[in-house]
């Protein structure tokens, strides 16, 4: 009999649910517990048995709740969503370990599979494979967004619960130990219940920085070095000559938090400098803690083990001259390193670390000097027969120092091209009266900008007071220059231009960088990457042409030499989706990448794509492994950056082991895609033409609803939680770029998040059904067969449909209809919702026909089971949220308890959906 692999997951969910129920009974009373349990059982009965009587009973019960009961129900089911996520993550870890323990073949997405595939199937020499990483860069980039609803305090509680579940899994506990573990779990669930889920005040940028840093403390600082070590060991196992080979720092975690100014007036030069200091503190604290522990471990006596001359000299320079450690050169050397790093801490941050050094010492001039001292320790251990000791904590510390430096994570700077344009126009008007920059056409603007880039003379005068906008932008770039001098050039690598639509947008940024000394024309030096961000459908279509013209400018090609002939380009998934819909956005991105590959190849420039993906499929989300493998040939080549946004950061990196697995997936997918034999399986012309036809039809359908239907904006604002999201203290950035209700002005993130909350997920599928219907009508004989072949043979199309499959499985039209009832105009409500319902049915029918499934997610039974297990806990939250929205709006939003309940429900639904923003 085949064992039920999901039984432990169900046991964990039952255990956590029981502990939460006990907590509710103890804290709120038996009546509250009985009510919540009745709602849960009714919801389970409806979902499990498709019992329509149970659905009516559920709706009647929820509609009859008092205000106080409503809040308790919302809290209980929201916390349960979080607990279910913890149990699910633990089950992923459990299954991965079981797979390894069974000696099974490596799974797709693992380092073992990727390396084995390269060596065995592609016949790559291990030395050549190691060389691949010499020029590679793989970087997930953390961003703060208006949908990140997790509080750090909640994350801390969840970490404790996850650790205790893991303990139950891995250890053979005695009865007393098992009882102690259960008591600890009970306390942790109680703490979670009594921890406020919402913030009392709106999040500041510094709060967001703190939130982001928690993932470095729990996951990245420890797991990245282990991943590097595992990869090096695997290469050494394949080629003994690589036994001592150390890979360069090709895998790094970046951040936008503290540097993303696009639409966020609260990101200033002062905030950037504070964010950099906070990051440095986390990195240095970690190094100091590791050195302290290393000093206690390396108690090696010179009478028993040798030491190199360099190590002895390092020990002699140490301020630790205690006679008790006179024969322990490794300990004394470590004490000296600690003292110098402690002085560095004080030098960079203005105060000493919590644990003082044995004595004063000179600070390190840069991180390379610290790395050199650690290398001296390493070489001495290896040369004197104690290489095993060099491969433990010291190995991980050396790797951490090389990856994280003194800056922890490079912070990207980002600003809208319109802002750069205004600043440059003002600077030119003062320096060159009559230049009339804004009145110039594109050619005139470029000529003026290239004139400025040909001279070292700055535009800005210290004797002129410019507008606040201009002063603020110049201050940011000057702060970036200071950061390079203080923390090293790794602190800020990239300056990103949002809404890039022409060549002048890139040259404007170049001129502003020159003002701060980050671009120095006479030296042909450029200290940061100038990164265009192409976001709308039109901009994506023009991207290759813009880059072609840029590379034709001699002065820019000279500057690229300072960046190793590598040019980064960012592609925006979110805005292109809001602009043209899911299908057209995906296709426009795919085509843009292929065109960029051709242009970059022709100019001999290395392309690095930065994918601005969100958590939801409507914003480019979905499994990273499949997404990377589905890239066009030549679009990766060892170079890839991608954003990690919203609640996805917590889901991917909140648990260290899950975080390690997600980092592995990025490396594995990048390796496999980069080493794929380019051009061997060119996409058939018929596939491309069909995709274009589908895209055109889907675009017309999507734009027809969202931008051309009278009253659609009213429908959206009244039938979703968009108004309430704007008031939720979950991000420092406003939900809209401008005041008003225009869809054009709304940020893509709350747009998608709002549709997810009401269980329509419209940005992740709308338009596909109509497009396929039109295609089949025009090709009645062979149309479906061709689409099925595209699904089987073209990874891009298969990934697109796989993501849509997942999105559609989370939709619920019955629940969505409850939200539609919030629309005051019945004619508007019925007409728009009926269009959505009809398109949803056409889309589901089309998807099932093409994928040859009977039900959604038949091809992914694990995900199907996971999502279905969530519905009984999500459904009550959605029903209660609708009722709270009705009461809130009827009462003009004056009841703080109702407002609080809405915000908790938003949190719980986001947790239950996992990738909604």
Swiss-Prot record:
GO terms for molecular function: magnesium ion binding; phosphoenolpyruvate carboxylase activity. It comes from the Bacteria. Belongs to the PEPCase type 1 family. It catalyses: oxaloacetate + phosphate = phosphoenolpyruvate + hydrogencarbonate. The keyword Plastid does not apply. Its EC number is 4.1.1.31. Its cofactor is Mg(2+). The gene is ppc. The active site is at residues 145, 578. Keywords: Carbon dioxide fixation, Lyase, Magnesium. One of its GO terms (cellular component) is cytosol. Gene3D superfamilies: Phosphoenolpyruvate/pyruvate domain (1.20.1440.90). It is an enzyme of class 4 (lyase). Forms oxaloacetate, a four-carbon dicarboxylic acid source for the tricarboxylic acid cycle. The keyword Lyase applies. This is Phosphoenolpyruvate carboxylase. GO terms for biological process: carbon fixation; oxaloacetate metabolic process; tricarboxylic acid cycle.
């Amino acid at each position: 009999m085949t064992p039920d692999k999901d039984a432990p997951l169900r046991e964990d969910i039952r255990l956590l649910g029981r502990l939460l129920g006990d907590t509710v009974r103890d804290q709120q009373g038996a009546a509250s517990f009985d009510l919540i349990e009745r709602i849960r059982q009714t919801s389970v009965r409806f979902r499990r048995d498709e019992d329509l009587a149970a659905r009516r009973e559920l709706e009647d019960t929820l509609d009859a709740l008092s205000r106080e009961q409503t809040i308790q129900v919302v809290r209980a089911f929201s916390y349960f969503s979080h607990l279910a996520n913890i149990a699910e993550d633990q089950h992923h870890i459990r299954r991965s370990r079981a797979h390894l323990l069974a000696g099974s073949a490596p799974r797709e997405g693992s380092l073992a599979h990727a390396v084995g595939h390269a060596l065995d199937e592609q016949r790559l020499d291990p030395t050549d494979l190691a060389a691949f990483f010499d020029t590679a860069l793989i970087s997930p980039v953390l961003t703060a967004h208006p949908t990140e609803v997790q509080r750090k305090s909640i994350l801390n509680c969840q970490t404790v619960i996850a650790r205790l579940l893991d303990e139950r899994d891995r250890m053979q506990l005695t009865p007393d130990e098992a009882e102690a573990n259960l008591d600890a779990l009970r306390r942790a669930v109680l703490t979670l219940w009594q921890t406020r889920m919402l913030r009392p005040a709106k999040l500041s940028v510094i709060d967001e920085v703190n939130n982001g840093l928690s993932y470095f403390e729990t996951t990245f600082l420890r797991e990245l070095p282990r991943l590097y070590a595992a990869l090096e060991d695997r290469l050494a196992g394949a080629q003994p000559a690589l036994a001592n080979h150390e890979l360069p720092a090709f895998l790094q975690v970046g951040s936008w938090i503290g540097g993303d100014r696009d639409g966020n007036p609260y990101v200033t030069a002062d905030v950037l400098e504070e964010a950099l200091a906070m990051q440095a503190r986390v990195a240095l604290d970690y190094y100091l803690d590791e050195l302290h522990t290393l000093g206690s471990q390396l108690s090696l006596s010179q009478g028993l083990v040798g030491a190199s001359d360099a190590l002895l000299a390092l020990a002699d320079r140490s301020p630790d001259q205690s006679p008790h450690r006179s024969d322990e050169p490794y300990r004394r050397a470590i004490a000296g390193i600690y003292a110098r790093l402690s002085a560095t801490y004080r030098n960079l941050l203005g105060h000493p670390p919590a644990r003082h050094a044995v004595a004063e010492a000179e600070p390190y001039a840069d991180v390379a000097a610290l790395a050199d001292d650690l290398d001296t320790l390493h070489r001495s251990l290896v040369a004197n027969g104690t290489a095993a000791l060099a491969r433990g904590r010291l190995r991980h510390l050396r790797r951490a120092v090389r990856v994280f430096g003194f800056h922890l994570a490079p912070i990207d700077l980002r600003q809208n091209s319109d802002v750069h344009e205004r600043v440059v126009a003002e600077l030119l008007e003062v320096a060159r009266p009559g230049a009339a920059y804004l009145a110039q056409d594109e050619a005139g603007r470029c000529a003026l900008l290239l004139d400025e880039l040909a001279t070292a003379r700055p535009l800005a005068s210290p004797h002129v007071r410019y507008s606040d906008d201009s002063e603020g932008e110049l201050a940011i770039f000057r702060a970036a220059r200071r950061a390079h001098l203080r923390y090293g050039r790794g602190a800020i690598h990239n300056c990103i231009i949002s809404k890039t639509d022409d060549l002048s947008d890139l040259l404007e940024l170049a001129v502003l960088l020159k003002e701060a000394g980050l671009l120095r024309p006479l030296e042909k030096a450029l200290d940061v990457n100038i990164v265009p961000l192409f976001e709308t459908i039109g901009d994506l279509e023009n991207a290759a042409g813009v880059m072609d013209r840029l590379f034709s400018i001699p002065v820019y090609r000279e500057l690229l030499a300072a960046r190793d002939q590598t040019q980064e380009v960012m592609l925006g998934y979110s805005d292109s989706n809001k602009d043209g819909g899911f299908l057209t956005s995906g296709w426009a991105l795919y085509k843009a990448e292929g065109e960029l590959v051709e242009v970059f190849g022709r100019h001999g420039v290395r392309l690095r794509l930065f994918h601005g993906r969100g958590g939801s499929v409507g914003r480019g989300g979905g499994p990273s492994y499949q997404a990377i493998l589905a890239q066009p040939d030549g679009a990766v080549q060892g170079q890839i950056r991608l954003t990690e946004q919203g609640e996805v950061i917590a889901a991917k990196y909140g648990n260290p082991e899950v975080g390690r697995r997600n980092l592995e997936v990025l490396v594995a997918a990048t390796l496999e895609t980069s080493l794929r034999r380019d051009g061997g399986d060119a996409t058939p012309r018929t596939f491309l033409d069909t995709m274009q036809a589908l895209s055109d039809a889907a675009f017309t359908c999507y734009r027809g609803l969202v931008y051309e239907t009278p009253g659609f904006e009213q429908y959206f604002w009244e039938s979703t939680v968009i108004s309430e999201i704007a008031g939720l203290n979950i991000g420092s950035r406003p939900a809209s770029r401008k005041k008003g209700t225009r869809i054009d002005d709304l940020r893509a993130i709350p747009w998608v998040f709002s549709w997810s909350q009401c269980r329509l997920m419209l940005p992740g599928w709308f338009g596909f059904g109509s497009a396929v219907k039109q295609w089949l009508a025009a090709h009645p004989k062979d149309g479906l067969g061709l689409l099925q072949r595209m699904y089987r043979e073209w990874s891009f199309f298969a990934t697109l449909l796989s993501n849509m499959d997942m999105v559609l499985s989370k939709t619920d039209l019955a629940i969505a209809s409850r939200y539609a009832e919030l629309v005051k105009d019945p004619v508007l409500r019925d007409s728009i919702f009926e269009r959505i319902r009809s398109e949803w049915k056409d889309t589901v029918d089309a998807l099932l026909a093409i994928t040859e499934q009977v039900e959604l997610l038949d091809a992914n039974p694990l995900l199907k089971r996971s999502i279905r297990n969530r519905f009984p806990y999500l459904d009550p939250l959605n029903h209660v949220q609708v009722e709270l929205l009705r009461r809130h709006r009827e009462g003009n939003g004056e009841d703080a308890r109702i407002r609080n309940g809405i915000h908790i429900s938003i949190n719980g639904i986001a947790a239950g959906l996992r990738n909604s923003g």
